């Protein structure tokens, strides 16, 4: 069995490669394709995809013989469209009766013709007056092949249009240089803005720290003043209470004088009473004496 390599881009491989379009790949397998095309020469590689296939021969004459012998043939109830990979057909007519995709796969089967268009458009630059080739029926393309087609299209353009490729590369290089300069300027501006913002943030932090220190100092001063005021108030209270007690103990000097005067009066009264009593006794004695005489 031949290998699966059918994507070499050298001129010899391109000219000895056969493209088979409108192939019913639900029925036709790789072994069937090799059996049909091996009669024209030795096959170096064969790859079957959804709706189409490639056959790589060792010699260009074998590939041309296969195109001449098999183009328009009915394979698995479909008329295949065969040509050299290096010489695609510009206008493909509706040779024979082709079955629609709805008949083959049902109404829900989706077709993707993008790979076939990209494959030929990338390799060849058609004149403006010639329309691009129409899509080949049942050319459903897998995602892996699409990525390969992007690489092949770039290679094809660089191989056949070297001057345009060089010009495009020089322009892209200049554009890249300009873009780099612009990006560099933008980055420097952003850096300056960031530095200024950082400086502003540092200033704000310093101011906030100063304000916090001032607030703390003010609070401490208030606390100290309030504590000193409380101490003074307590001292004054203590002094006032002590003075009241002293005054209560000492008493009023006027009251003492009054008390002394009252005591003197009482003594005088007592003395007067004693005198009167003595005088009364003397009178009695004198009257008694007179009576005795």
UniProtKB/Swiss-Prot annotation:
InterPro entries, per the entry: hnRNP_C, Nucleotide-bd_a/b_plait_sf, RBD_domain_sf, RRM_dom, RRM_HNRPC/RALY_subfam
Gene Ontology, cellular component aspect: nucleus; ribonucleoprotein complex
Location in or out of the cell: Nucleus
Function: May play a role in nucleosome assembly by neutralizing basic proteins such as A and B core hnRNPs.
Gene that specifies this protein: HNRNPCL1
SMART domains attached to this UniProt entry: RRM
Protein name as it appears in the record: Heterogeneous nuclear ribonucleoprotein C-like 1
Sequence ranges of Acidic residues compositional bias: 242-267, 275-284
Family statement: Belongs to the RRM HNRPC family. RALY subfamily.
Region Disordered: start-end pairs: 137-177, 206-293
Sorted UniProt keywords: Coiled coil, Nucleus, Ribonucleoprotein, RNA-binding
Sequence ranges of Basic and acidic residues compositional bias: 206-222, 229-240
Domain RRM: 16-87
UniProt keyword Ribonucleoprotein present: yes
Ranges in coiled-coil conformation: 177-225
Listed PROSITE patterns: RRM (PS50102)
Pfam families found in the cross-reference section: RRM_1
PANTHER family xref list: HETEROGENEOUS NUCLEAR RIBONUCLEOPROTEIN, HETEROGENEOUS NUCLEAR RIBONUCLEOPROTEIN C-LIKE 1-RELATED
Organism: Homo sapiens (Human)
A single MF term (Gene Ontology): identical protein binding
